[in-house]
């Protein structure tokens, strides 16, 4: 409840296999189940992750919220990363952005 941050650790497709459903648009808005989702911004912070800002509207209630998605890009398929440095940098970025927030981070 009240989540304003999502950490995504997998690519959408890996070696031709779907890993995760895409629930945000490339640009503009889309409807996904009971939500209208607007891509506000997308920034590549480094080769290991990018950050998206999504504006969500729950269609039945009209409630709106801005959610930040941190998308980790360099987790290798079927194994662990060779170094934890990029993942720790992502963790620091998430912690810095949401320090003091009382809402959960969805991973």
Swiss-Prot record:
InterPro entries: IA-2/IA-2_beta, Prot-tyrosine_phosphatase-like, PTP_cat. Belongs to the protein-tyrosine phosphatase family. One of its GO terms (molecular function) is protein tyrosine phosphatase activity. One of its GO terms (cellular component) is secretory granule. One of its GO terms (biological process) is regulation of secretion. Its EC number is 3.1.3.48. It is an enzyme of class 3 (hydrolase). It comes from the Eukaryota. This is Tyrosine-protein phosphatase 1. It comes from Styela plicata (Wrinkled sea squirt). It holds the Pfam family Y_phosphatase. It catalyses: O-phospho-L-tyrosyl-[protein] + H2O = L-tyrosyl-[protein] + phosphate.
């Amino acid at each position: 409840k009240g989540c304003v941050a999502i950490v995504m650790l997998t690519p959408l497709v890996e070696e031709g296999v779907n890993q995760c459903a895409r629930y945000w648009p490339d640009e503009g808005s889309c409807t996904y189940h009971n939500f209208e989702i607007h891509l506000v911004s997308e920034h590549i912070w480094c080769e290991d992750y990018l950050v998206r800002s999504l504006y969500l509207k729950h269609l039945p209630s009209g409630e709106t919220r801005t959610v930040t998605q941190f998308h980790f890009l360099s987790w290798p398929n079927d194994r662990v990363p060779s170094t934890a440095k990029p993942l720790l940098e992502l963790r620091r970025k998430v912690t810095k952005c949401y320090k003091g927030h009382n809402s959960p981070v969805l991973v």
